């Protein structure tokens, strides 16, 4: 998910307070033991979170280095990022490039976030491959474009939040059929794109402090859906 979220990235070391099935340790034997506990159903959900956190801490340097290398490649060679979104952001007086696209380890389970003061944060430990990174960068760059063009109120206006989430999910490529079908197990053949955009926009709105609950998030998304889904600026159409 994206938007102006506070993305945690701390040095916490997982220490189980009870028997969760997770055993701390970075050696091969301990890793095999933890994997066996997961495969046999002997690790609780809390234990799985501890396992993932330990893995992310262990791989942090490599994850961030890979993310930065792929980020720099995409900025140089990806048409949607370098020649289009980046250029349109520049035309509005902004600048999104490697100096403010930060690859970090995140403790929240999301792909990235945008903050008008900070720039873009990519959760390096959540990136599955270069294609996933490209979609995430495009999503967050759409937020940057909307912030500059429409002067969004990120703090209190849920309609603004819903609109930019609809546009970012629709235009970034993250809701194209192949990604939904093969990565997320969403197997519908009709209205798949629209349902993906609605679902992801509502989840992002629901994470904001001003949103009461899931029903409130859905209501706000529905209120702005028609105008925001049809608005494909700066693109001529949804092409990914």
From Swiss-Prot:
Extract one GO BP annotation from the record: mitochondrial proton-transporting ATP synthase complex assembly
Residues annotated as binding a divalent metal cation are 139, 143
Listed A to Z, the keywords are: Hydrolase, Membrane, Metal-binding, Metalloprotease, Mitochondrion, Mitochondrion inner membrane, Protease
Q: Where is this region: Disordered?
A: 1-27
The main location class comes to: mitochondrion
Q: What is its EC number?
A: 3.4.24.-
GO MF entries: metal ion binding; metalloendopeptidase activity
Q: Where are the transmembrane segments?
A: none
- Compartments in which it is found: Mitochondrion inner membrane
**Pfam families, alphabetically?**
Peptidase_M76
Q: Which GO terms describe its cellular component?
A: mitochondrial inner membrane
Task: Indicate the residues that form the catalytic site.
Answer: 140
The record gives the membrane topology as:
Peripheral membrane protein
Q: What does this protein do?
A: Has a dual role in the assembly of mitochondrial ATPase. Acts as a protease that removes N-terminal residues of mitochondrial ATPase CF(0) subunit 6 at the intermembrane space side. Also involved in the correct assembly of the membrane-embedded ATPase CF(0) particle, probably mediating association of subunit 6 with the subunit 9 ring.
Which family is it part of? Answer: Belongs to the peptidase M76 family.
Under the heading PANTHER family, the entry gives:
MITOCHONDRIAL INNER MEMBRANE PROTEASE, MITOCHONDRIAL INNER MEMBRANE PROTEASE ATP23 HOMOLOG
What is this protein called in UniProt? Mitochondrial inner membrane protease ATP23
Question: What is the species of this protein?
Answer: Ajellomyces capsulatus (strain NAm1 / WU24)
Its lineage opens with: Eukaryota, Fungi, Dikarya, Ascomycota, Pezizomycotina
